[in-house]
Amino acid sequence: MSIRLENLSYTPGARKEKHRKGRGHAAGKGKQAGRGQSGQKKRSTVRLGFEGGQNPWFRRVPKRGFRNFNKKEYEIFNLSDLESRYQDGDTVSLESLYLKKVLKKRNLKAKLLANGDLTKKLTVTTNAFSIAAQKKIEEKGGKIEVR
């Protein structure tokens, strides 16, 4: 007899039939279906955070605060940073602030605050600024532009 596709068969014991649990005694895994005695864990798993009927942690601890998803994040820099890194008459942009390592992230918005003194005339382009910082820059003849 020659070997042909219709003659091929598996070696005995190579393929096992799937046991369908909980489908009656005749199926081989009926009644308790390998789950042991009756009880809570036989039914299904207990839900996440369940502590056996004790008042769970997330209900014992009081609620507090929330996370504002509309919050505007600014990277802050001060007039003292500008004083030490720029010459009189320079233009200060967000890109130049990043290149001079004043800002840590290139694409984050930046806000200028009035900490420190300024002795130079500068043109500053930024996303936001404090009124005190604007006043100090304009006193020295500089100007502020909002980007």
Swiss-Prot record:
Q: Summarize subunit and interaction data from the UniProt record for this chain.
A: Part of the 50S ribosomal subunit.
Which keywords annotate this record?
Ribonucleoprotein, Ribosomal protein, RNA-binding, rRNA-binding
Q: Which GO terms describe its molecular function?
A: rRNA binding; structural constituent of ribosome
Family statement: Belongs to the universal ribosomal protein uL15 family.
- UniProt feature coiled coil, ranges: none
Name of the protein this chain belongs to: Large ribosomal subunit protein uL15
Query: Which domain of life, per UniProt?
Result: Bacteria
Q: What does this protein do?
A: Binds to the 23S rRNA.
The answer, when asked if Lyase is one of the entry's keywords, is no
One term under GO cellular component: cytosolic large ribosomal subunit
Q: List, in alphabetical order, the GO biological process terms annotated in this UniProt record.
A: translation
Basic residues: bias regions: 16-28
Q: Where is this region: Disordered?
A: 1-46
Pfam families, per the entry:
Ribosomal_L27A (PF00828)
